[in-house]
From Swiss-Prot:
Cofactor: Mg(2+)
Subunit structure: Homodimer.
Listed name of the protein: Selenide, water dikinase
Active-site residues annotated for this sequence: 15
Family named by the database record: Belongs to the selenophosphate synthase 1 family. Class I subfamily.
Segments crossing the lipid bilayer: none
Residues annotated as binding ATP: 18, 47-49, 67, 90, 138-140
GO molecular-function terms, A-Z: ATP binding; magnesium ion binding; selenide, water dikinase activity
Reaction catalyzed: hydrogenselenide + ATP + H2O = selenophosphate + AMP + phosphate + 2 H(+)
Known function: Synthesizes selenophosphate from selenide and ATP.
Entry's EC annotation: 2.7.9.3
Pfam families: AIRS (PF00586), AIRS_C (PF02769)
Highest rank taxon of the organism: Bacteria
Source species: Nitratidesulfovibrio vulgaris (strain DP4) (Desulfovibrio vulgaris)
Amino acid sequence: MTVDRLTSRSRAAGUAAKIAPGDLERILATLPRDPREGERVVVGTRDNEDAAIVRVPGGKAIVQTLDFFTPIVDDPYLFGQIAAANALSDVYAMGGEPWCALNIVCFPVKELPEEILADILRGGADKVREAGAVLVGGHSIEDESIKYGLSVTGIIDPDCYATNTGLRPGDVLLLTKPLGSGVLATAVKAGWDGFEAHEQELGRWGAMLNRAGGRVIRELGLAAATDVTGFGLGGHLLEMANASNMSVHVDVSTLPLMPAVLDLVATGLLPAGSHANRHFCSGNVSVHPEVDSLLVDIVFDAQTSGGLILAVPPHLVDDACSILRAEDAPFWRIGHVEEMGEGVSRLVLQP
């Protein structure tokens, strides 16, 4: 049997397949709120948080999330690892620890060998095990378009967690993975020259757990953090700035990029989701004239299983860096937070 490349079976790859933020915002605004939320919910849907935090008996809390997407690589095992790491990331971004997970599967079982699905599931299971969580089942649907991910339940201290609303003036912004996965995934899907190397780079970073960043949040009691996924670095920073009523300043020259990303963007290669992100955010962004427009595109590139943005008070920066180094986790200092003032944009991109 001739097997198509996994990435050829979907319209968009990874988190770039998300519904555009503006469309999603309009749809969700029509839904009523459950009046019982206040009894149980510590953190809900109001500020576009990465996950929900819900009280349970005994003074404890769980953190709950769900994430799945279409393939961004052709290797099934690697796809399973990336999809699982991406789903687990939401728990880490709140400061929680993954506890158990359920598989979410859509697969054309009559068209593709069963071994492909087995490899996807094996990749996901290995990553869940690496996170210290337990895989306890799942649900599958026969579908022409391959999709895989997890529903993850974590444990968390109901009095110590990070959200989009916790930015404070002076906070230093640390990023724990380089940017460009949306661009590289588009190159892989299109089969561009060198796409095999791009796939390996996507696997290197996408399958990396954000566990070290979660440890920083817990041990230092950080109030603000998020992970960078489908709305891009710019979109997720803007969510934090809006929720916290702050202005976020990014030093674009410090942003880490995956290999070849800048060259690919220069040729015009950018996923549709990235264009949608930039358009949606444009009214709240100020770009210094010396900032390269290609870098602005990358700021809004739709990421899959991206790094954490950690907002660290100045007096805790050294401690945060020490924890990340002890975990052998990469990180970059990319900007800071200021109070909103007259004529100041929510998101400022400076050289």
